[in-house]
């Protein structure tokens, strides 16, 4: 079982290790050499706004193993607007499980927790071609493929 909570400053080193692994594997991609620092800055901004009670459209969820109380994964969701500027859906921008915890159903539990925590929101996720595990996880959790770019990036949408 997992506990889902909002991330805080002390989670950033754990998350950045997973981001580094994701960049290495090709699951995450950022332009330029400063991509890693850009992600860190973005995460720090989100946790600072949480700490200061500033409303934002981003959700940084951290998932802890219940018995050990240690983080095993995270997800960053971002609110997206339509052309009129209205909130239209949430995008799962980043999603990762610690390498030593993969293959144990943790990703499935994390995704289920996200779905349950965001009722009434349209959820979407995009995957780069190397993200085969994530594509399978999404497809097996009620997400349907809605778009594939020429570069192979696939976008999925949750369907009840």
List PLM regions with ranges.
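Conserved N-terminal glycine/acidic-rich loop preference
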Residues: 89-93, 132-146
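Conserved catalytic-core motifs of GNAT/GCN5-like acyltransferases
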Residues: 126, 142-158
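Acetyl-CoA-dependent GNAT
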Residues: 6-10, 20-29, 33-93, 98, ...
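Extreme N-terminal starter segment of soluble prokaryotic enzymes
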Residues: 1-4
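Hydrophobic pocket/interface hotspot
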Residues: 15
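Conserved GNAT acetyl-CoA-binding A-motif
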Residues: 118-129
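Conserved acetyl-CoA-binding loop-helix of GNAT-fold acetyltransferases
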Residues: 97, 103-116, 136, 140
């Amino acid at each position: 079982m997992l506990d889902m909570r909002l991330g805080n400053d002390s989670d950033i080193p754990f998350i950045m290790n997973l981001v580094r692994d994701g960049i290495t594997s090709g699951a995450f991609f950022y332009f330029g050499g400063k991509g890693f620092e850009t992600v860190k800055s973005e995460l720090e901004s989100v946790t600072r706004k949480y700490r200061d009670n500033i409303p934002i459209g981003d959700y940084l969820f951290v998932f802890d193993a219940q018995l050990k109380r240690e983080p095993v994964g995270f997800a960053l969701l971002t609110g997206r607007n339509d052309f009129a500027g209205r909130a239209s859906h949430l995008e799962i921008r980043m999603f990762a499980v610690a390498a030593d915890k993969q293959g144990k159903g943790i990703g499935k539990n994390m995704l289920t927790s996200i779905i349950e925590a965001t009722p009434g929101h349209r959820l979407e996720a995009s995957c780069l071609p190397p993200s085969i595990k994530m594509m399978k996880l999404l497809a097996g959790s009620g997400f349907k493929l809605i778009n594939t770019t020429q570069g192979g990036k696939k976008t999925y949408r949750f369907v009840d």
